[in-house]
Amino acid sequence: MRGKLIFLFGIDGSGKSTMLEMLKNSKLKNTIYTSCMKNAIFEEELYKAEAILHFSRSEVFSHEFKHVLHIGSVIYNMYDKIIPVLNNGKNVILDRYTICIKQFTDLFLKPSYNCLSKALDCLPTPDLGIYLDVEIETAVKRIEQRSIKTGIPPHYSESKKALIMKQTTYETQIPNEAYPIVKIDANKCIDEVYLSILNILNEVYATTL
């Protein structure tokens, strides 16, 4: 791949999606900002069937089945949309990547289903991961504020207990990843976190000139 593949990650409430939106307004050249996890093509088919046939997926299908669809959608989105962009020489900054899916698999699915995430090994190794390190209490407050603003209650995987589990898992995973990961303090105000990320990206881009 001629372009750089970089991704932001952290527990819920760390600000990764907010940072990606702010980066879209930055002046970084030759860069695409997106997510390989949204617009999940195969999951959307399930949601359409649910609406048309009037059933609840949680009553018919397991978490594991939905996760298979999610992994398939991520792989499809990467090969269909993102890898071609990288091959054309553009840099791509993602909101989350494979380490996040593997973490969810380890924490919330039956142990016998951990093998499912091995399908993600077909995806390219990123050039850099940027970990937004945030305190649990700060993350909980941000999630609560978002819920009040949107009217959407937090997902079960966003509970305080789940956040602690996710943070612990990330700290275990990070040293074992086969690519560089930079950790930044995401407890600071949004503008400071944004500037920290922007400085890191400018340094990465400078080394490729």
Range-by-range predicted roles:
Residues 8:
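Hydrophobic anchor at the beta1->P-loop junction of P-loop NTPases
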Residues 11:
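P-loop (Walker A) phosphate-binding loop of NTP-binding proteins
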Residues 14:
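ATP-binding Walker
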Residues 101-169:
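A glycine- and Lys/Arg-enriched "phosphate-lid" helix/loop adjacent to the NTP-binding pocket
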Residues 140-209:
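NTP-dependent small-molecule kinase module
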